[in-house]
Amino acid sequence: MSEVQSPVPTESRLGRISNKILSLRGASYIVGALGLCALIAATTVTLNNNEQLIVAAVCVVIFFVVGRGKSRRTQIFLEVLSALVSLRYLTWRLTETLDFNTWIQGILGVILLMAELYALYMLFLSYFQTIQPLHRAPLPLPDNVDDWPTVDIFIPTYDEQLSIVRLTVLGALGIDWPPDKVNVYILDDGVRPEFEQFAKDCGALYIGRVDVDSAHAKAGNLNHAIKRTSGDYILILDCDHIPTRAFLQIAMGWMVADRKIALMQTPHHFYSPDPFQRNLAVGYRTPPEGNLFYGVIQDGNDFWDATFFCGSCAILRREAIESIGGFAVETVTEDAHTALRMQRRGWSTAYLRIPVASGLATERLTTHIGQRMRWARGMIQIFRVDNPMLGRGLKLGQRLCYLSAMTSFFFAIPRVIFLASPLAFLFAGQNIIAAAPLAVAAYALPHMFHSIATAAKVNKGWRYSFWSEVYETTMALFLVRVTIVTLLFPSKGKFNVTEKGGVLEEEEFDLGATYPNIIFATIMMGGLLIGLFELIVRFNQLDVIARNAYLLNCAWALISLIILFAAIAVGRETKQVRYNHRVEAHIPVTVYDAPAEGQPHTYYNATHGMTQDVSMGGVAVHIPLPDVTTGPVKKRIHAVLDGEEIDIPATMLRCTNGKAVFTWDNNDLDTERDIVRFVFGRADAWLQWNNYEDDRPLRSLWSLLLSIKALFRKKGKIMANSRPKKKPLALPVERREPTTIHSGQTQEGKISRAAS
């Protein structure tokens, strides 16, 4: 099975020529040598502004000519070109723009320079990290099923609703693997009776942990379970990540073939929209925030043998976990720290860019920010207590990839500095960049152009231009304190569980998640108005230097305002009235009349159709049936999934214009299993996760402006915090007898599977 790729655009003649040149024997060495010479020249050659403008124009032309190519060498060339232009900008900043008249100017100017150095450092690290994505393909398993390993599937849960967890458990029980070689465990922090009962009903195994208050949260839960299980491998699924049936068959091959691989990570795909997708006007046409990491960065990490463990949707070798004493408990991001510790011991990690599970995205901006605060705290903790640049066991590539991941969470402070810098002049008259507009055009604009344009080429449809700025700005003012406190006191902070599942019956504005940016934007607007007043009313009284400074800082303030307003727009929470998220799916089905009770099962009045979307609540089908608007009609829906037949009872609510809407008749556990299989378990369910157009920066900027416009529509009420209603527990189901294990009363020796 291979990943479905979007159609490759036809290359132009110039693109083919540039690819041929870069593919010639020895071309890579020539390009590398030329690039090194150019980088040296960038730090030594002095040019006046006019000469620099010519160089900048030539570099832009080179970008457009070479950028027509689609090869990997083309991308590397563009990254080297971008690095050259950025180093040229850095040289200019260090040598010609630090002419300060007062000590206040000096302090503010150095602060801005430090933020720029951080941004350039992250830019160069990202180029290194993604220079050669591995694009690993699945490996087949041994032909003899007897040679397949045993697997324990861990589903840890703390305070999540059973209605969410049960779908993951049923999906895991349906994974296509020899029944005597797989066990599914609910790891319950807190021993809740309804979870134990559900395990008995569905045939899963249950491990409850009573004393969880000071027991290292999720990492402690996993370590508690490791001591009570024995499978060769452990598949970890967050309690909302529902696997496809093919998960293990797709992802296990590399683990069996290479005994040095300790981890096989797969993408975290979400079937529900994140707050940015749901709340912004063009969000649904924009890739999810996490796609950049799972589509580009992790593939780059894999080349350097530096794939991170992301806490879920991953297979781990038990031997490797036991070799480091279990999951890391020193930080609140046990996943990345565990991978780092395994790699220090010589284990390899791997990444497969095929989504084989899907979960719920954070559904409210408040919870999204809270989750990112935990990630930032955890990665900074690792930076402090187990810095990848120190200690033994890691190769240089691994050190740099981990360093990039950890220091990327320092973004909050530089982001605030970039946004606020024009206020230094607009409010206090402190010009912290001593440069004429021509110099800015010659040095700064080319640096910005190449950074944005090269990122668009590298990221393609995984992340759109300017959206990283919006993501960071949304969270920056909340993360500043977390960053500083964790750097100074890495032991502070605790694990928090991300709340998921629920509805929002009315459109609301989340003031609690946006008030810092609202205050920030108000101050920025004040500064912009002052600058415009000076330019319009007092223009003739200003000297040339003052006019240039006001023009530069007003333009800067306007850019900051655009980003701030886009971040504020995310707080406009749109209605979410469905408990069950609909998923687009095109599945051939046969719809037929449900037989009366006691009657033989026959395909009476069978009609073929194609599903439009599916959910745990029902399905929409395009089907040539006469219009039905008078009431519910009992039907059955038949499909063939991955070579196996499935048949689900449903009620047709209506049929108009060839589209029929059904609700599932979900009255027993077996039916619920089939629905989970139909909606989430298909091997090809999520292969279109990257089905987004390639990035075009101007189009991306326009989409942000449309989102800002939508912020001011007259609808919705202001709220201090967003609390979605919880989904009620699912219907009671038939009972089945399993084995139950509680902390402190573990059955010694063996754990048997319940009858299914």
UniProtKB/Swiss-Prot annotation:
Instruction: Enumerate the subcellular locations listed in this protein's record, separating them with semicolons.
Output: Cell inner membrane
What does the record give as the function of this protein? Answer: Catalytic subunit of cellulose synthase. It polymerizes uridine 5'-diphosphate glucose to cellulose. The thick cellulosic mats generated by this enzyme probably provide a specialized protective environment to the bacterium.
Notes on the domains: There are two conserved domains in the globular part of the catalytic subunit: the N-terminal domain (domain A) contains the conserved DXD motif and is possibly involved in catalysis and substrate binding. The C-terminal domain (domain B) contains the QXXRW motif and is present only in processive glycosyl transferases. It could be involved in the processivity function of the enzyme, possibly required for holding the growing glycan chain in the active site.
Q: Which parts of the chain span the membrane according to its record?
A: 27-47, 49-69, 106-126, 167-187, 409-429, 432-452, 470-490, 517-537, 551-571
The species is: Komagataeibacter sucrofermentans (strain ATCC 700178 / DSM 15973 / CECT 7291 / JCM 9730 / LMG 18788 / BPR 2001) (Acetobacter xylinus subsp. sucrofermentans)
Domain spans labelled PilZ: 576-681
Q: What is this protein called?
A: Cellulose synthase catalytic subunit [UDP-forming]
**Enzyme category, top tier:** transferase
